[in-house]
């Protein structure tokens, strides 16, 4: 009987340790200019909380769109590309910004990031989100 309280304490400690806090949020800052993303490639851990802050320092409206793994928008973004979007923020006015927190894709790989405004992909507004397996 004396072992039971000791055993319960050990089990409780193990359970609490298994429920440890989630890892820290990864913060990414992206600047949109005419016509590029800075940085144009960023790496994040898979399945983790991510905060992306995007600032448009350009003179025209831009968008920030993450395509699904294995898909691209091609030379231009068409309406049927909407089915291939992992996450999108549209119409970021010049001088505007936004910040969003979401769970990153769980599948490691390279995800295309684009501005879908007409002519912007062809002008070089294409970036890369690299998702790596968590530790």
How would you describe each model-predicted region?
Residues 1-8:
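Bacterial N-terminal signal peptides that target proteins for export
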Residues 15-18:
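C-terminal motif of bacterial Sec signal peptides marking the signal peptidase cleavage site
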Residues 24-50:
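N-terminal edge beta-strand
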Residues 36, 87-135:
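Extracellular/periplasmic metallocenter environments
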Residues 40-65, 98-107, 111, 131-133:
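Beta-strand cores of secreted/periplasmic/IMS beta-sandwich domains, seen most often
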Residues 62, 75, 120:
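Histidine-centered active-site/metal-ligand motif
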Residues 68-70, 121:
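Solvent-exposed strand-loop boundary residues in beta-sheet-rich modules
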């Amino acid at each position: 009987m004396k072992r039971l309280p000791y055993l319960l304490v050990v089990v409780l400690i193990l359970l609490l340790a298994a429920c440890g806090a989630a890892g820290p949020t990864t913060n990414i800052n992206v600047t949109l200019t005419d016509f590029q993303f800075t940085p144009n490639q960023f790496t994040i851990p898979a399945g983790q909380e991510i905060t992306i802050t995007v600032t448009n320092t350009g003179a025209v409206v831009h968008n920030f769109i993450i395509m699904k793994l294995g898909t691209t928008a091609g030379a231009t973004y068409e309406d049927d590309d909407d089915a291939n979007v992992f996450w999108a923020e549209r119409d970021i006015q010049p001088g505007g910004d936004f910040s969003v927190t979401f769970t990153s894709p769980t599948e490691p790989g390279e995800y295309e990031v684009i501005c879908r405004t007409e002519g912007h992909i062809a002008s070089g507004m294409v970036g890369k989100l690299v998702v790596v397996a968590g530790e």
